[in-house]
Each structure stands twice: as structure tokens, then as C-alpha cells.
């Protein structure tokens, strides 16, 4: 069956497998301790962004690498610190956290070029270099969509257990 024809409910199966793998091999669960937008943890945000990215890709029948899309989306904010703390290294977080996330992800996982590009370019246009791959463009849109909802309308987003 073509990826675009798979039922949306299978997104949860694909995602849960990827999440378990990243939790086992790296520090993904540390993201539960940090709150980037509203009251949503980085972990919850990353799961929502991965789900939304895959939903968009399937809904619009885009020919993409689903595994890379999910992994890149789950790791896009893998910076592993609380950027709200009074610390000079956290200034200009929006500009610098993609490179920190990429460095941390490379320490814990073997990334392919699509995943690397997704992580380091997800803040476009705040960071001026655009994404190179379709998966990274999808992530940019899904991340901004989820962050906006989490910040302005937190009750509209579901809670990740």
C-alpha cells in the first residue's frame, strides 16, 4: 500500500515505534523537563510536531521519507536545556538552539542528511538559510503551527501522556 493511502490511525503505530527507539537510544525523555511554549513540554511539543508533520505529508499525498520525517521532527528541539533560565548561553535561543539540537542529536544517534537538515533549518525564516528537503519544509510548517496553538490556544491541543 502506498504511504499516502495508509489510514491516519496508523500514524500512531509508526510514531510509537520511533519514539520508543529514540527514548531507548538517547536522551529524548529529558525533554519532558523543559517547557518551551505555554505549558507544553518540549517532549509533548516534539511528539505533536512529528504527528502533525506526518499528517500533513499524508493528507497532501507528498512523496517523502516518513522515517526521516518522524525522526527529524522528534529531534528538532533536542537542545536539552531550559532556555528560560537566566544564563547568557540561552540568549537568542531561537537563533542558536537548532545547532545545539543537531549537536546533541549527532552525539546520540546516527542521522541521515534529511534529518540533519530538518533539525538545523527548522527555524527558517528566523534563521536565514532555508531548508533543503521537503521533509524539512514540512517540519517548518508543522512546528510553527503547533507552537502557535500551544501558545495562544493551549486547550485546543491534545495532551500527550
Could you say what each language-model-derived stretch is?
Residues 1-161:
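Metal-dependent phosphohydrolase cores
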